[in-house]
Amino acid sequence: MNKKTIIYSIKSALPVMTGYSVLSIGFGLLLQDKGYGWGWAVLMSTGIYAGSMQFVTLNLLSTGASIITTAIMTLMVNIRHLFYGITMLEEYSEAGWRKPYLIFSLTDETYSLICSPDLPDDINRKDYFFIVSLVNQLSWIAGSIIGSVLGNIIPFDTTGIDFAMTALFVIILLEQLEKSKQHLPAITGFIISIFCLLLFGPNQFLIPSMILITIALFIEKKSLERSDF
């Protein structure tokens, strides 16, 4: 793991690290607002590390949800990670000792950083994956602790903080559209998502849309490799 790879990886991850720090501070504030201390912030951000699911978990904890309800909700919220993993099978197959952690730490934003870049020849690709994944999680853990501590010291109005995660998704999408010449995946995802939203409703559209998007992109894989659209 050379110095150049470390520096390059951190620079690449810096936008997500910044966003994660802000979002996780919000999570820490909400956690404290629900009556859970910084120890819970460390535990959840280390052991769960799934931004949107951590926000959902707060509601599940505060309402005393059953294990079955929690399991079903977790599956529904994080089912998209299954599709991320499918696309990374080849990349992660030779990751060696890094592989278990890479699988665990594959979040939406980390996926957006590791699935698209054309890395310089002198940058170790597997080390890049690992460092980006690690620093992203460390920034999330640090922000969670800071938010929890601040929430204990200073009173905050936490209304609307959970929308920050959605805002980050939108920003990442716009950055990807700006950098990439291939806009067909985003257009395909948008059209299919709207279709499934209208067909299945806001509470049921996520899984069908992810399945249809994955099928559509596999079908269009060859044309995507040739196209600049």
Language-model features and meaning:
Residues Y8-I103, P117, S139, P185:
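Pore-lining transmembrane helices
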Residues L82-E91, C115-L119, I171-E178, A216-D228:
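C-terminal ends of transmembrane helices
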Residues I25-L29, L58, I86, S148, ...:
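Transmembrane alpha-helix boundary and packing residues in multipass membrane permease domains
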Residues I72-D162:
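Helix-loop-helix junctions within the multi-pass membrane cores of secondary transporters/permeases
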Residues M1-Y8:
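Short, Lys/Arg-rich, polar N-terminal cytosolic tail immediately upstream
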Residues N124-P208, I215:
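Membrane-embedded alpha-helical modules
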Residues Y49-S52, M76-F83, L168-L174, S193-F195, ...:
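Alpha-helical transmembrane segments and their membrane-interface exit regions
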